[in-house]
C-alpha cells in the first residue's frame, strides 16, 4: 500500500512538473495577459500635435502580453507593437518606486526566473525517477518548485501593481474600468498553484523515503544482531558485573581469614604433613566398628596432640613478631 501511494505521488509529481512548466512557458510566450482599450490602434496617439483624443473615443480593443501589445480593432488591426514602458512624454523620477516597478515590469525577470526554475525542477524529477535511491534529488526538485512558485507569484503581483503602466494610453478616469485579464494571466496563476503542489509532494516523498530507509536499516541491524552467534552469549555488562562480584568475593574471603593464627598455621605446618594428617583420617571413615583397636586411637591422639602443640608454638611466635615489629 505504501509503495502504491508513493508510486501515485511520484506520478502526480511528474505530471505536475510537466504541467507547471508548460503553463508558464505558454503564459510567457503568448500576448493574452491583458485585454484593454488603446488609441494606438487607430493612429490617434501617434503624434501629440493634434491634442488628446475626443472623450467618446475610448480606443480600440487590444490584447497585450509581457512584451507586446496587439490590436484587435482599428486601423492597425492584427498588428503588434512592442510595449514602451517609458514613454518620452512622461518624466520619471529615477529614485521613485514607480520607476523601479516599471523596470521590473519591463524586464519580466520574475516570470523568466520561474520558468528556468521549473525546468530545472522537472529535470530533477526525471533524474529522481531514474536514480530512485538518490533521495536528495527529489528534495532538490521540491525546493526548486517551491522557489519557482514564489518567483511566479512575485511576478504576478508586480504585473498587477504596474497595470497603470499598461501600454494603453487611456485617461486616468478610464484606467479602472476598461481592462480585464486574459487567459495567459490565468495560465501563469495556475502554474503557481501547480508548482507549489508539486514542491509539497516532492518534499513529502523525500520524507517518506527517508523514514522507510531508516526503518529498513534498523530492521536489518536488529535481524543481523539476532542471527549473530554473539547474541546468544551473555552481555558484556552482565559478564563484567559477574566478574567484578566474583573478584570482590575472592578478595573478601582472605580478608576474613587473615589472622595471626590462620597465617601461622599454614606457615608452621608443611602442606605435605597436613595432607598426610588429613589422609590418615580417611581409613577411620570407611572402617567399621568391628575393626576398632586401642593402638589406632593412641596413634591418632598422638598426632592430634602434636598438631595442637605446633599450633600453639606458631601462635606464640607470631605474637612475638607483632610485638617486636616497629610501627
Curated annotation (Swiss-Prot):
Detected in heart left ventricle. It comes from the Eukaryota. Pfam families: PMP22_Claudin (PF00822). Glycans are attached at residues 42, 45. GO terms for biological process: positive regulation of synaptic transmission, glutamatergic; postsynaptic neurotransmitter receptor diffusion trapping; regulation of AMPA receptor activity; response to cocaine; transmission of nerve impulse. It is found in: Cell membrane. Residues 31-107, 158-186 are extracellular. The chain crosses the membrane at residues 10-30, 108-128, 137-157, 187-207. GO terms for cellular component: AMPA glutamate receptor complex; cell body; cell surface; endocytic vesicle membrane; glutamatergic synapse; L-type voltage-gated calcium channel complex; plasma membrane; postsynaptic density membrane. Residues 1-9, 129-136, 208-327 are cytoplasmic. The modification Phosphoserine is found at residue 259. Residues 235-261 are annotated as: Disordered. GO terms for molecular function: calcium channel regulator activity; channel regulator activity; ionotropic glutamate receptor binding; voltage-gated calcium channel activity. It is a multi-pass membrane protein. Residues 246-256 have a biased composition (Low complexity). The keyword Glycoprotein applies. Interacts with CACNA1C. Identified in a complex with the L-type calcium channel subunits CACNA1C, CACNA2D1 and either CACNB1 or CACNB2. Acts as an auxiliary subunit for AMPA-selective glutamate receptors (AMPARs). Interacts with GRIA1. Belongs to the PMP-22/EMP/MP20 family. CACNG subfamily. This is Voltage-dependent calcium channel gamma-4 subunit. It comes from Homo sapiens (Human).
Amino acid at each position: 500500500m505504501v509503495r502504491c501511494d508513493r508510486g501515485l505521488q511520484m506520478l502526480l509529481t511528474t505530471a505536475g512538473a510537466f504541467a507547471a512548466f508548460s503553463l508558464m512557458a505558454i503564459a510567457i510566450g503568448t500576448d493574452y495577459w491583458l485585454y484593454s482599450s488603446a488609441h494606438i490602434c487607430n493612429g490617434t496617439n501617434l503624434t501629440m500635435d493634434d491634442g488628446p483624443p475626443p472623450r467618446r473615443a475610448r480606443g480600440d480593443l487590444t490584447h497585450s502580453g509581457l512584451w507586446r501589445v496587439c490590436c484587435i480593432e482599428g486601423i492597425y488591426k492584427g498588428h503588434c507593437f512592442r510595449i514602451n514602458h517609458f514613454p518620452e512624454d512622461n518624466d520619471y523620477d529615477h529614485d521613485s518606486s514607480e520607476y523601479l516597478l516599471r523596470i521590473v515590469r519591463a524586464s519580466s525577470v520574475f516570470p523568466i526566473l520561474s520558468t528556468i526554475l521549473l525546468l530545472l525542477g522537472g529535470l530533477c524529477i526525471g533524474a529522481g525517477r531514474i536514480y530512485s535511491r538518490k533521495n536528495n534529488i527529489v528534495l532538490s526538485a521540491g525546493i526548486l518548485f517551491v522557489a519557482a512558485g514564489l518567483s511566479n507569484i512575485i511576478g504576478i503581483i508586480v504585473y498587477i501593481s504596474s497595470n497603470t503602466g499598461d501600454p494603453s494610453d487611456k485617461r486616468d478616469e478610464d484606467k479602472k474600468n476598461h481592462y480585464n485579464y486574459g487567459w495567459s494571466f490565468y495560465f501563469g496563476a495556475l502554474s503557481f498553484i501547480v508548482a507549489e503542489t508539486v514542491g509539497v509532494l516532492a518534499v513529502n516523498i523525500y520524507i517518506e523515503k527517508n523514514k522507510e530507509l531508516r526503518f529498513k536499516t534498523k530492521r536489518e541491524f536488529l535481524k543481523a544482531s539476532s542471527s549473530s552467534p554473539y547474541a546468544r552469549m551473555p552481555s558484556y555488562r552482565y559478564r563484567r558485573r559477574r566478574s567484578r562480584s566474583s573478584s570482590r568475593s575472592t578478595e573478601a574471603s582472605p580478608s576474613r581469614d587473615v589472622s595471626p593464627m590462620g597465617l601461622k598455621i599454614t606457615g608452621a605446618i608443611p602442606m605435605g604433613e597436613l595432607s598426610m594428617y588429613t589422609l590418615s583420617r580417611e581409613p577411620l571413615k570407611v572402617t567399621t566398628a568391628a575393626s576398632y583397636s586401642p593402638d589406632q586411637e593412641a596413634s591418632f591422639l598422638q598426632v592430634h596432640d602434636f598438631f595442637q602443640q605446633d599450633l600453639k608454638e606458631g601462635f606464640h611466635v607470631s605474637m612475638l613478631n607483632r610485638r617486636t615489629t616497629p610501627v
